[in-house]
Amino acid sequence: MDNRNMINRVFSQKILHQIAIKNKSDVVDEAYDFYIQGPKNINVIQKMKSLYNYLKKSYRNEYFYKNTILNKLLLGRHSINTTTALSEMPIGKSIADFILLNGKGVVYEIKTELDKLDRLDNQINDYYEVFNYVVVITNDKHLNKVMARYKDTTVGILVLTTRNTLSEVQKPKENNSLLNTKAMYNFLRKEERKRVIAQNHMDVPTYNDFTEYDVLFDVFKKIPMTKLHNNMISELKKRGNMKEYKDEFLAAPAEIKFLLYFAKMPKVWG
């Protein structure tokens, strides 16, 4: 197995589920023995914390970036009481790495030291069809290229520094010029679309399972864009259900908070 692939597998939902069921993981053990070669008599979460420290110092992969964003932005600047996070959400032909929703929706596109920038323009354009704030999170390696493309635009730029802090290079600005009703409709789940329509007291013609998508969209697209976008953000915020596990989640190790948040399994470490 490729050594990098080994450590990438450690920080995954599949491994988290294994730990929840068995309280151990052969993948974690193998990676720990390879990278850390430390004491054997520690539990699986302690091994994951040691492996995360390796990521911090030697291999800042996408998981490290995502977990840093969750800890420093969702938990550091905001609150799980008022803010909802989404991850790996398809928008057009792109996948949004991380989205924060409070009074507004902000898409965070991650470009690690390991990534290329080839698709970045297309990704940003896709995101602006659904959300009006977009931020690129990158590093010193890519900063000059990112700045050359997006300086003095509406795109925000954050840098994950060598000290593993987030430094704001350019503040994001609201951009409504590319918002697209069809893209927003497709981003929402079926019941969310229906609630948005109901909130606006729109008359809905009779439909069946075969005509539902088109009939509801014909109604949906008549809602004024500003109202529509605000309603969409409100609906998306409801997807967060970590509040019932708040105390347990906040007490969990910082190294695995991203996995726990999106797995909705905050008692894995117990």
What positions do the PLM features span?
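Interdomain/boundary linker segments immediately adjacent to catalytic/signaling cores
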Residues: 1-60
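Nuclease catalytic cores
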Residues: 21, 58, 62, 221-225, ...
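A conserved mid-domain beta-alpha-beta active-site/ligand-binding segment of alpha/beta enzyme cores
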Residues: 165-237
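C-terminal, charge/polar-rich interaction regions
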Residues: 222-270
